[in-house]
Amino acid sequence: MAFKQLFAAISLALSLSAANAAAVIEKRATCSNGKTVGDASCCAWFDVLDDIQQNLFHGGQCGAEAHESIRLVFHDSIAISPAMEAQGKFGGGGADGSIMIFDDIETAFHPNIGLDEIVKLQKPFVQKHGVTPGAFIAFAGAVALSNCPGAPQMNFFTGRAPATQPAPDGLVPEPFHTVDQIINRVNDAGEFDELELVWMLSAHSVAAVNDVDPTVQGLPFDSTPGIFDSQFFVETQLRGTAFPGSGGNQGEVESPLPGEIRIQSDHTIARDSRTACEWQSFVNNQSKLVDDFQFIFLALTQLGQDPNAMTDCSDVIPQSKPIPGNLPFSFFPAGKTIKDVEQACAETPFPTLTTLPGPETSVQRIPPPPGA
């Protein structure tokens, strides 16, 4: 059974289980901290949680270390190719932690440039707590997202055996790849379609770039990089006017706001006829954003794994805070209006949004992790 079909079956089973929860007495285990979990083996992850919140995420912040931890999940997980396996070649193990186990090899791959810093920061926690790299990467990514206001309640499953060999190069999409290349890549990895590709890119709502422009680091993709919201989907549809740094870098196109970066792949996917309407659908629709990203994140973290053999430890992941009440879910940054939108969806009009008051928005850089 293909991964996507298996994952759908697991999701259905979980939904049916939740629907009947009132009629079933759920067995819960009580941990030493007084919290309860569905499986006693999950209790150990509370110690990991406390440690990384304090010593990796600086008290639970949605900062550079959180952003890079989320990026690491995708780069570890997407490195799997059933098409290569069908040709008799090793196609990678997906969400197996190979990028940390074989970091000297995989972080040297071009799309993984810069990830060596977060791998270096995370490795001591793996060694200290005796967990597998694949499980830790998924856990740290889920916790990182929970630190970002507006994020969904993240799921986390354990049960990943350590990788035995590095993933092959060429499996992680690049900013300069075409839409066709990226759609084909995610379809090969997990039978994901073009709509689910857009869901994956929701992670760019809480992200920054350190390595596209060598002259400047910590450039966010939108004006609210510390909040999991739909501003990324608004601002990628605004007309680009300038580069935040040197310009002319491979995979970079003009962005609409000073201090904000736009990569070529986001620009083209936002305007492609196959993806433009799904892209626009997230504007001012926080509930859709949350639901779709919750699904796709779990699917990514189970690539290459058997979900039936994994243990659900989602109880350990904190719940994120709501989006600050002084901000609408979506808006035009100060100085921008509907006239700046390059709408590509032919099916529905662009949502009506307010423009924030004040001078033109300038986006602040995010300090990169130590050593970056």
Curated annotation (Swiss-Prot):
Binds 1 heme b (iron(II)-protoporphyrin IX) group per subunit. Binds 2 calcium ions per subunit. Optimum pH is 2.3. Glycans are attached at N285. Pfam families: peroxidase (PF00141), Peroxidase_ext (PF11895). Keywords: Calcium, Cleavage on pair of basic residues, Disulfide bond, Glycoprotein, Heme, Hydrogen peroxide, Iron, Lignin degradation, Metal-binding, Oxidoreductase, Peroxidase, Signal, Zymogen. Residues 350-372 are annotated as: Disordered. Ca(2+) 2 binds at S205, D222, T224, I227, D229. It catalyses: 1-(3,4-dimethoxyphenyl)-2-(2-methoxyphenoxy)propane-1,3-diol + H2O2 = 3,4-dimethoxybenzaldehyde + guaiacol + glycolaldehyde + H2O; 2 (3,4-dimethoxyphenyl)methanol + H2O2 = 2 (3,4-dimethoxyphenyl)methanol radical + 2 H2O. InterPro entries: Ccp1-like (IPR044831), Haem_peroxidase (IPR002016), Haem_peroxidase_sf (IPR010255), Ligninase (IPR001621), Ligninase_C (IPR024589), Peroxidases_AS (IPR019794), Peroxidases_heam-ligand_BS (IPR019793). Its cofactor is heme b; Ca(2+). The record marks R71 as: Transition state stabilizer. Heme b binds at H204. It is an enzyme of class 1 (oxidoreductase). Pathway: Secondary metabolite metabolism; lignin degradation. Its EC number is 1.11.1.14. Ca(2+) 1 binds at D76, G94, D96, S98. GO terms for biological process: cellular response to oxidative stress; hydrogen peroxide catabolic process; lignin catabolic process; response to reactive oxygen species. Residues 1-21 form the signal peptide. GO terms for molecular function: diarylpropane peroxidase activity; heme binding; metal ion binding. This is Ligninase B.
